[in-house]
Amino acid sequence: MKDLSEAKQELIKSLVKNKKFHQLEFEVNSLLLEKRSPFLLNLLGVSKISKVPTSKEDLNESLDLFKEAYLKDRTLIDALFNYAEISIRLLKYDEAKDLLIEYLSKKKYDYKATLALARIHFYLGNMNDCLINYKKIIDNNEANSKLWSAFLFTTNYTYKYSQKDYLNFCKKYSEKLEKFDEKIIKKFQYEKNPKKIRLGFFSADLRTHSVAKFIEETLKILKKDNYEIIAFSNNKLGADDLTTERLKGIFHEWYDIVKVNDLDVVNLIRDKKINILFDLTGYSTGNRCEIFKNKSAPLQISWCGYCNSSGLKEMDYLIADENLIKKEEDFNYTEKIIRLPKIWNSHYLISSEIKINELPAIKNKYTTFGSFNNYGKLSDETIETWSLILKNNNSKLVLKSSVHDHQLLRDNIKNKFKKNGIEGEKIIFMERLKNYDDHLKMYNNIDISLDTFPFAGATTTFESLWMGVPTITLSGEIFNSKFGLSINKNLNLDTFIAKDKNDYIEKAKIISSDINKLSQIRYSLRNLAINSPLFDNKDLGLELCKILKDKWRLFSQQNKNL
């Protein structure tokens, strides 16, 4: 900037201040004809990404500009941060990762660089490295609510922290959440003995999402059973879709709260006389923990969207089932546990018209294992175990993810398998498909599904079973590591539940060797699933209706003076 004339400096300052980025881009481009200074290169990059609208070409050009600026002047740290940010948006962060690591190796700590590196590791599926960087930010007392939530959510993907550690982290985060002054919060408006108990449902996923697949039919049962159901939707702007419209037709009332501040949401929920408020988000994206920290409803229940403890003392209950959380395991959760007698969730019935094809192994002469789980769930232990299976079997592995699928991530996964002795031709990546029926038909390429651990699959396991593909699962110690256990138990498929990694490997070997039995299972599994609790929405809904009435009755008896 100091190399410019005083008039040019004032012009650029004015353009930046008034957000005239198109004109700024023109001015900087003309100056660069004389001298490609790092400052001007970075400024041109900023002008390109600040324009409205910003094109893909602008983003790609800015990426090159930020990189050139930083490599010319390693003291221009803003250029590095800008380069990292745009590289994440464009999924081109291999070089940015190396530059951030190099920068941080010379500097004890830097918030922006550490955060960018954590995000890159997350998108590459390096969850332990992601957690290391998140933890550095937390230890330096620079973690905001969004980062804390991301950290807590990510701990579910690895064995890095115990459940005891996790609960301690939750407690620390809870202490940082804003507790509103009672003077500005409206008093509870609920009726103790209402004709209809009013149930509130908070979620950021009332759209085409796994959460909707599990709650839609249950909501209909609750509605029929004399409950009033009210939605508090935190769907991000533009995310509403046909599923949203369908859900709106089920709820008695619907409130979009994504642009409403937490205090006003708390008061809104109290105004609406909500008796029981469900959190369907937990620490997932779009959460609003302050709403529950400030006790928006007299009873608050965590269910479906986040299957671990919230760690909030204000959260009264967590819904699980008899298989997921044994009574002797209650100490792992701050909430009281509501145990549904069969299964914690039931999936809506999928179309029976989707054909189940012949077992691929019959034609292929080898076993095709598969996992359609989020690639972030492919922990180091999972890849190590799957590699041993692939070494010991005439087999291949099909992978597909509905989120965070890009070439750098695939390459990283292949490299992890290669370190475990498995070459790339053994690993087959399938493309993400938008059409749901087409997605389900891809299970016709798989003989046996392999579950991930410690974070097990839920939606993917329901879908796999529907398509006649059984899932080998490893039972863990906490809620979200036992999805496969509960699902298989409800189908009496104990043969597919492994007690440890060696047992998991042995089961894969034995089950894949019996082609005839596997073929029989394939054609009988859908009917078995249809007639099980997995898809019995009515039974689950009625059980929940009864439990909620009991919980409200108990609360009313214990709080007569409220």
Q: Residues of each region from the PLM?
A:
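Alpha-helical solenoid repeat scaffolds of the TPR/TPR-like class and their adjacent stem/linker regions
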Residues: 1-366, 384, 415, 421-422, ...
